[in-house]
Amino acid sequence: MKLLKRLVSVFAIVLAVGSNAFAGDEVRIVIDEGVDGARPIAVVPFVGSAPEDISKIVADDLRNSGKFNPIAVSQMPQRPTSAAEVNPEAWSNIGIDAIVIGQVVPSGNGYSITYQLIDTVGASGTPGAVLMQNSYTVTNKWLRYGAHTVSDEVFEKLTAIRGAFRTRIAYVVQKNGGSQPYEVRVADYDGYNQFIVNRSAQPIMSPAWSPDGQRLAYVSFENKKSQLVVQDLNSGARKVVASFQGHNGAPAFSPDGSRLAFASSRDGVLNIYVMGANGGTPTQLTSGAGNNTEPAWSPDGNSILFTSDRSGSPQVYRMDASGGSATAVGGRGSAQISADGKTLVMINGNNNVVKQDLTTGVSEVLSTSFLGESPSLSPNGIMIIYSSTQGLGKVLQLVSADGRFKASLPGSDGQVKFPAWSPYLTK
């Protein structure tokens, strides 16, 4: 049996900041479009009861990826509780080639979660074979985390892609009233377990994760001017790292966490700068006519994408991280490269989220929501979160990178914007 304490250490760091600042009105996923073209799978209701529905969390995770289409419980030909009870033919006859079964039982001051992933068609050699199995003991507080762990392992086994269901998102909420209506919040990727990292009477913008998941950089206007703040998620300590004359915004950590790229109008025109992650003297990268903003690093740290209106209208450019000439990439802004360096996600001229294959140059529109902004990729490149306008406010939207699955994460206590997906938070 495996105890999850070792795996939740970084999550615990994130929760430490918000332990006394729980944000009661969480954002929760509301499905907009399903995944009919995805791979069918069955997550059989786990035996036993717990405060959280483990099998539903696993099914939701797999659906959110766009790779799988979990069938309804009512469609299941049987509800086995062990591999020995599985009738492979009953499942293969309805097009299901893999099922997840399990149980959750009280254990000490928490619960034991056990699961098995079963091959129903013999792809592994024998129909009914156990593809993988595992068991965890978690406290009540970490039940959802335990379920996300099952999801990550099942997802990786079936796709050969590392799962990202134990990651988190940071975002800004502008509440409907109160003396400090602006808040930086952090939550599980699906909107649960939300906590406040910082609140202010003045606007907060553009949170960005450090690559180790232990710091957030963001823009704060709390001193009546735009400043870049880096906050440690373990201690809660905050440090102003840029407070230059003019506007300072759009921070982005380098892949090794040692540097920050950002936009500043310290010399009158908005340009891209790079400095140490703890502050210091910045190096100017862009120059000339036009405003330059929204820097984003390539995975190897050798180049930077940014948005510029130097040609008369905003579009994405790419340049060496040491400076020099820039090459137009396309789109309108908010670019990010996937961790494997193969895909570019950005906003196009119609304010839609698009992805572009950097090898072929082929682009695909993933969203048609109104005024899409700030797309952020999951660390495995499978899911994208972004903000859009609904009615008079901003909400978060989730879309799978293949465009199959779309969902909303509306906030009930204010406008939600500037989402940023965390790096992996486990080894």
From Swiss-Prot:
Signal peptide interval: 1-23
Alphabetic keyword roster: Cell cycle, Cell division, Periplasm, Signal
Purpose: Part of the Tol-Pal system, which plays a role in outer membrane invagination during cell division and is important for maintaining outer membrane integrity.
Protein localization: Periplasm
Subunit description: The Tol-Pal system is composed of five core proteins: the inner membrane proteins TolA, TolQ and TolR, the periplasmic protein TolB and the outer membrane protein Pal. They form a network linking the inner and outer membranes and the peptidoglycan layer.
Family matches, as HAMAP family: TolB
Identification of the protein by name: Tol-Pal system protein TolB
